[in-house]
């Protein structure tokens, strides 16, 4: 490892493009504020969704990351990239929430080289990081990144598309990905990840009832099939980001980059709970960030999904996810256990590979002290070896 008198703040996430770039920008920000040396680690990665759907044009795999040489200029890599530091999928500063960012200067450091960066909005963590100044410095840092010639070309193409909308546009980011389509993502529904995605049924109603006065709406989604169904449901009055692609043969990272640049030019960005894709667009632009789960009440979201759950002809996985969100809203609003169970049963009918519906049913039976029914389901699971 290179030796520096100043300590290192390193960006070394190992997940999706958006999260990696958010972490990289945060590392650049911290280096400026605390006079640390900035560095990054970038390992290529192929997402399993890519293998599953590589012969189709149905899904954009935002977790598929190509080599650093295809994204960044060689000068940027030579100056800031580290091969000797391992990549890491998760790192957070939330243990420092409410404290000053200058606490990072206190010894001992987290690692011998200094600190790892995180991908989150630092203005929601550190008490003295003010959003306006923070985002201004993030944009400055973004402009300092030396991208490859190809990625600079893609950036210019996205900016051209944005200029086509003289009156501006509103962006809606519908995140699905591994949360909705991958078996490994299902178990996380019981924790934080259910809110990381967003239901197409919910978005359809938001457009129909709350954004019907907006002239230009662009949908950004990793599920292209569902996006087309949504557009038809909205009488073709919305645009899909994929319609503006400068090259239909772009790689996943190239397409992600194009869409993030375009999204960053929106006046407002409606997004799910915590997606790196839309967060990065907010980091590098001046858009108003609107989290759907915070902007609308639980009862509104609940009714939004119910409004078209039988009309919107989505895939079974998407419909199962919508039913699970109905279950979550019903539980949080303390609706009857019978109603909660109804949504779980409907969701399981749509996707019997997703055992989260069964686990949630068991939880309800335990809460009702119906141990006999809970044990019966558990025995069936063990007998069938379904877990």
Name every feature range the model reports, one short phrase each:
Residues 274-329, 351:
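Catalytic binding pocket for nucleotide-activated donors in carbohydrate/polymer assembly enzymes
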Residues 11-15, 21-29, 43-45, 256-301:
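A donor-sugar binding/catalytic signature common to diverse glycosyltransferases
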Residues 199-215:
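Short, basic/hydrophobic alpha-helical segments
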Residues 316-387:
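Alpha-helical protein-protein interaction scaffolds
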Residues 214-288:
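Donor-binding and catalytic core of enzymes assembling or modifying cell-surface/extracellular glycoconjugates
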Residues 50-63, 227-236, 377-378:
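Short, aromatic/basic amphipathic alpha-helical patches
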Residues 3-184, 188:
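Secretory-pathway glycan-assembly enzymes, especially type II membrane glycosyltransferases
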Residues 168-201, 218-224, 328:
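Active-site donor-nucleotide binding/catalytic segment of nucleotide-sugar enzymes
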């Amino acid at each position: 490892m290179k030796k520096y008198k100043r300590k290192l703040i390193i960006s070394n996430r190992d997940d999706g493009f958006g999260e990696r770039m958010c972490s990289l920008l945060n590392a650049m920000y911290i280096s400026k504020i605390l006079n640390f040396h900035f560095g990054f680690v970038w390992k290529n990665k192929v997402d399993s969704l890519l293998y599953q759907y590589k012969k189709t044009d149905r899904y954009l795999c935002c977790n598929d990351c190509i080599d650093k040489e295809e994204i960044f200029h060689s000068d940027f890599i030579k100056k800031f990239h580290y091969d000797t530091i391992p990549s890491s999928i998760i790192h957070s500063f939330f243990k420092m929430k409410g404290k000053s960012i200058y606490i990072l200067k206190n010894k001992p450091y987290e690692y011998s080289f200094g600190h790892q960066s995180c991908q989150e909005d630092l203005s929601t963590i550190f008490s003295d990081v003010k959003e306006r100044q923070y985002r201004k410095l993030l944009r400055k840092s973004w402009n300092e990144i030396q991208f490859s010639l190809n990625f600079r070309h893609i950036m210019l193409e996205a900016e051209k598309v944005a200029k086509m909308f003289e009156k501006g546009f509103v962006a809606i980011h519908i995140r699905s990905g591994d949360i909705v389509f991958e078996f490994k993502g299902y178990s996380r529904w019981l924790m934080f990840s259910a809110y990381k995605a967003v239901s197409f049924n919910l978005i359809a109603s938001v457009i129909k009832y709350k954004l019907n006065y907006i002239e230009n709406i662009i949908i950004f989604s990793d599920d292209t099939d569902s996006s087309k169904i949504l557009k038809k449901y909205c009488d073709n009055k919305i645009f899909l980001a994929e319609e503006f692609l400068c090259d239909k043969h772009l790689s996943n990272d190239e397409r992600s980059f194009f869409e993030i640049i375009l999204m960053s030019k929106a006046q407002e960005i409606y997004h799910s709970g915590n997606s790196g894709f839309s967060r990065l667009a907010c980091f590098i632009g001046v858009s108003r960030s609107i989290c759907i789960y915070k902007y609308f009440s639980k009862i509104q979201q609940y009714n939004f999904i119910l409004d078209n759950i039988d009309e919107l002809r989505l895939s079974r996985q998407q419909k199962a996810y919508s039913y699970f969100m109905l279950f979550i809203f019903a539980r949080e609003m303390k609706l009857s256990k019978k109603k909660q169970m109804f949504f779980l049963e409907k969701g399981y009918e749509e996707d019997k590979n997703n055992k989260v519906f069964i686990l949630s049913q068991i939880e309800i039976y335990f809460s009702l002290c119906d141990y006999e029914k809970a044990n019966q389901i558990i025995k069936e699971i063990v007998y069938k070896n379904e877990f």
